Amino acid sequence: MTILLTAALLLSGCGQRLVMTRGFGKKELFRIGNTQCTLPEYNVFLLNLQKNCERTFGHDIWQKENGESLKEAIVQRALSEASRLKVMLLLAVQDNIMLTIQEENLADEAESVYYEGLSEAEKEYLDIDEDTLRKLFEQYALAQKVFKSVGANFEDRYDSFCTTLDYDLNESLWSTVKLADIEDLADTPGFSEVYSGYFGSSDLGKEVVVEEEKESTE
């Protein structure tokens, strides 16, 4: 698991310093700098990726020959996206970038649509309250504003900023990470699908995809 986390942080562009520590909150999965990500937040990313996979390959993909490797890939990808999001929030603070009232209202609407569209089984799996979920939509929108504000030099700025940060993993909680075992998972809208309906497509995961494609060709 430690190797997997290190790889995921590297894919997010932030893998310079990985520190194992104790003293985490009950649901705190990892820390980057002075921000954190909880397990419920991480599960939103993971569930979103799982939905996409099951829509393409079917619910039983995880029991097929390459199911385990695909599972490991999306667990890693979800961690990469969550890590990248949290770093971009720190950049937003540094650059004094904030959402407008209108953008906050859009995030509130998106959260309501997403939450109401979840099945009871999905809500139980995520174990996330609506306020945290609303903030996650806000954070996603804020990260996109950071990306657009920096422009063409974003990756250089991001990589440079990452070298100043420490990364702390709640290893015992990380060991509990698992996919949702929900048969009709693909029938409900995913987080990114709802987000794009209100804010347009996000660039948050694009660098992750590029890095993964590079590795697959090496």
Predicted regions and their residues:
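N-terminal targeting/tethering segments
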Residues: M20-I128
